[in-house]
């Protein structure tokens, strides 16, 4: 089996060389040397120095060595691990820049030769890109090399026929918000409300996102490129990146030890049977249901109502339709469309500009668990106003008008499933392997940052072993900080803990704390308050963007890297991507592998539809969604 890991085979030490040029300012001397060597030189009041790997490193120009001083230092890796890794990254960057690659933030290297124009939009070029990361696995260093694609404008910004929100500087590797490009003057936002004119506009290309791809009609081709060409990117590594053989051997693949590839057999328990597949819920029925499915329709105008009337009748009033069959298969006792007692109509109007309803007297009397089927005239980029302004006693289920004409059966079935997800008395399934884990509390923590506004949002979400959401807490617009505010975290943790007690009438025996990213806080403080009442705990770091992957199909497999670090590959419709999990602390009676199994199962304790899986463990998925949006998350998270 292939993994994109290559052992770094160089001495584990760094050389520091010093230079003194009496005829030039150290800052200017360092800047010139950095430019010609594609490697950063540092300076002080009198000296210039460079930290390099202990290998054959060619510094140019040759006459620079007349300024070299005798002082030379060797720093071993065990003396300064951070310096060793940092220097390796700098050297790898130099190798790429020396070989006609662009650098992009995040150790992405964009090929200037492996590039082609898109068939669906000739103004866009697809550049083969390699993302690089250094890993320490069992005290050995490895390089992961992940092929991907970057979509840039074919022409420089001022000449490009299409535009996007961001510009990429091919020299600095940085991206900036695009402001304008009038009269041959390119303006960008460099942050802190500073808008500047660009001195060298020829160095700026538009960088296109997935949203841009939808806007300009090349999203389908992007998907095809990732589906068909990433494999080629892996195969090209030994030849295209041969210059990396200075630090590794690209012809030697990482060897996975016996027993380090793990498969978890996930079994869903439904009312009338068991299956490995969530979609079999339509075969075996909801684990718990027998509720009526109540709904009410909202239209933007009478004109819209008459335009979709035929489609709606076929879908929602035909007792033999997919909608009715799906409701019966999931165990709903009946389907009921609420009608105004005065007008006898189940059709209501809303204001499409403000998203407010027009018959508030009747609407306000409606009890909980009623679906609001809202017909939208067009795609809404920001759906927050709809969620914010609609009555809280309704469960929003919006549908695009244009989708009604040829809505596919599996989408209708997913729609009915989603409705059931939002009814507290319904339970689609339970996982067989999680059935006996009711004494565990699972908590996800996410920090999202707005560097432009210099604000941070903190979110915590807690679920039980069946995926029931016990608590969600969010703190918005905190001062920008990579570290969590531990006072806030402690208060939120106590609330989640109390919600567990409220449901089960007993304290949890084990608490799983899953952090999106690394714990850079003082974990002794965290351990102190989560061990309240002698609760056992585990602290888990989750990296949702691991660089380790393969051209082999690893979906539904777990890879063990070392005793505390694993990668699982969820089965999704999208391209194969792994999630790296590191057990930082284990104070429970579970083994590390048993903890990893539960973390993986948390990706399956709930489904937004029975045809898709979550990439992240459910409490972390919730925290991630809630932290990033103000209201939109309420459309997807049943809380």
UniProtKB/Swiss-Prot annotation:
The active site is at residues 446, 482, 516, 624. Residues 101-153 are annotated as: Linker L1. Its cofactor is Mn(2+). Residues 210-292 are annotated as: Linker L2. Induction: Expressed at low levels (at protein level). Probably part of a cas1-cas2-ago operon. Its main location: cytoplasm. Residues 425-639 are annotated as: PIWI domain. Mn(2+) 2 binds at residues 446, 624. An RNA-guided ssDNA endonuclease that may play a role in defense against invading mobile genetic elements. Uses short 5'-OH-ssRNA sequences as guides (gRNA) to bind complementary target DNA (tDNA) or target RNA resulting in target cleavage. The cleavage site is 10 nucleotides (nt) downstream of the target residue base-paired with the 5'-end of the gRNA. Reaction rates are fastest on 5'-OH-gRNA:tDNA followed by 5'-OH-gRNA:target RNA. gRNA between 17-21 nt supports equivalent rates of cleavage, has no preferred 5'-nt. Belongs to the argonaute family. Long pAgo subfamily. This is Protein argonaute. It comes from Marinitoga piezophila (strain DSM 14283 / JCM 11233 / KA3).
């Amino acid at each position: 089996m292939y993994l994109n890991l290559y052992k770094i085979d160089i001495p584990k030490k760094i050389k520091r060389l010093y230079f003194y040029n009496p005829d030039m300012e150290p800052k200017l001397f360092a800047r010139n040397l950095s430019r010609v060597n594609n490697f950063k030189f540092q300076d002080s009041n009198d000296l210039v120095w460079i930290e390099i790997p202990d290998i054959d490193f060619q510094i140019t120009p040759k006459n620079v060595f007349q300024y070299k001083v005798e002082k030379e230092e060797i720093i071993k890796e065990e003396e300064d691990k951070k310096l060793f890794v940092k220097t390796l990254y700098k050297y790898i960057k130099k190798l790429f820049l020396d070989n006609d690659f662009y650098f992009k933030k995040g150790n992405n290297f964009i090929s200037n030769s492996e590039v082609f124009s898109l068939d669906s939009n000739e103004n866009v070029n697809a550049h083969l890109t390699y993302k690089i990361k250094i890993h320490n696995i069992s005290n050995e260093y490895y390089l992961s090399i992940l092929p991907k694609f970057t979509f840039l404008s074919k022409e420089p910004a001022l000449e490009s026929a299409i535009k996007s929100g961001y510009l990429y500087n091919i020299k600095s590797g940085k991206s900036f918000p695009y402001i304008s490009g009038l009269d041959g003057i390119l303006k960008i936002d460099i942050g802190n409300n500073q808008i500047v004119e660009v001195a060298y506009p020829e160095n700026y290309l538009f960088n296109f996102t997935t949203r841009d791809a939808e806007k300009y009609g090349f999203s389908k081709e992007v998907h095809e490129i990732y589906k068909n060409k990433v494999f080629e990117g892996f195969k090209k590594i030994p030849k295209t990146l041969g210059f990396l053989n200075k630090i590794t051997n690209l012809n030697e693949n990482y060897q996975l030890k016996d027993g380090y590839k793990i498969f978890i057999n996930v079994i869903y328990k439904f009312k009338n049977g068991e299956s490995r597949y969530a979609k079999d819920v339509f075969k075996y029925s909801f684990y718990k249901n027998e509720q009526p499915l109540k709904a009410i329709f909202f239209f933007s105008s009478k004109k819209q109502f008459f335009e979709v009337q035929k489609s709606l009748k076929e879908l929602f009033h035909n007792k033999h339709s997919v909608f009715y069959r799906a409701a019966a298969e999931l165990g709903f006792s009946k389907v009921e469309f609420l009608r105004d007692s005065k007008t006898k109509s189940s059709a209501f109007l809303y204001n499409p500009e403000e998203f407010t309803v027009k018959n508030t007297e009747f609407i306000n009397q409606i009890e909980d668990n009623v679906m609001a089927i809202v017909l939208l005239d067009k795609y809404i980029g920001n759906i927050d106003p709809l969620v914010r302004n609609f009555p809280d006693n309704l469960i929003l289920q919006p549908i695009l008008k244009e989708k009604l004409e040829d809505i596919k059966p599996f989408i209708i079935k997913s729609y009915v499933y989603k409705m059931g997800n939002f009814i507290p008395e319904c339970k689609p399934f339970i996982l067989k392997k999680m059935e006996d884990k009711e004494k565990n509390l699972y908590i996800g923590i996410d920090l999202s940052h707005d560097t432009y506004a210099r604000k941070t949002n903190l979110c915590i979400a807690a679920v039980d072993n069946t995926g029931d959401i016990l608590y969600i807490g969010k703190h918005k617009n905190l001062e920008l900080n990579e570290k969590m505010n531990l006072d806030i975290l402690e208060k939120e943790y106590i609330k989640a803990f109390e919600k567990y007690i409220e449901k089960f009438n007993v304290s949890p025996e084990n608490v799983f704390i899953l952090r999106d990213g690394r714990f850079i806080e003082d974990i002794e403080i965290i351990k102190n308050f989560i061990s309240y009442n002698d609760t056992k705990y585990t602290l888990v770091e989750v990296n949702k963007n691991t660089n380790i992957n393969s051209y082999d199909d690893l979906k539904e497999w777990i890879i063990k890297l070392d005793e505390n670090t694993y990668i699982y590959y969820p089965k999704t419709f999208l391209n194969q991507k792994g999630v790296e999990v590191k057990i930082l602390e284990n104070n429970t009676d579970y083994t590390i592998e048993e903890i990893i199994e539960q973390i993986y199962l948390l990706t399956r304790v709930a489904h937004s539809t029975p045809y898709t899986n979550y990439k992240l463990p459910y409490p972390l998925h919730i925290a991630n969604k809630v932290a990033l949006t103000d209201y939109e998350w309420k459309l997807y998270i049943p809380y």
